Amino acid sequence: TYLPVVDCLPYKKGNDIVEQMKVPAGAVPDSTSIEFMYTKNGKEVRFDQANFPTDFDSTYVYVDRKDIVVKKGNGLVAKIVDFSLQSVHGTDTTAAIFANQKPYVLVFAKEMKGAESWKNQFQSIYKKLQSQNIEVILVTPEADRAAQLFGNINILISDATVIKTAARVTPTYFLMNGSRIVEKVAAPTIDQLFTTLNSK
């Protein structure tokens, strides 16, 4: 499967992910208030932080809380709001990965279902990149399954929705320089990644 010819996403070739995560100048966020829901003596009680009950004690049983927008912001938000790379132990490694001074490849795979169909090609690409001393990192929400399929490779976890936005097909290869996307290809056009890599 090929990537779309025109990439209008914030994860397109040439973009810097860190720059895309910055809130635009002049952005005004929504103003919110927290509404708490408790029960006391079998009755539901709702209040916000400004009207906290004076008799609040252990007889109040927490039910829920909601953020209520009291004043709408101007809608200016970062183009990328939820990108993160986690280790298999849950440590956020995004900044450490982006601090990488050498080119590296992030391979995005939204799911491992059907991975058998691209496993051999991935392993061939992986070996070729390794022979050029290029670090390869598989990014997926399904780290356990990826480890079963691909063995001892570097795996990071990211949310499936984030991956779906960043990479329209599985797998998608990002040649990275720090946090900048130097090249972005799907498997059928992987030669373009090597051409770009070898032209540096």
Question: What is each of the regions a protein language model found here?
Answer:
Residues 4-200:
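Extracytosolic and intramembrane catalytic regions of membrane-associated proteins
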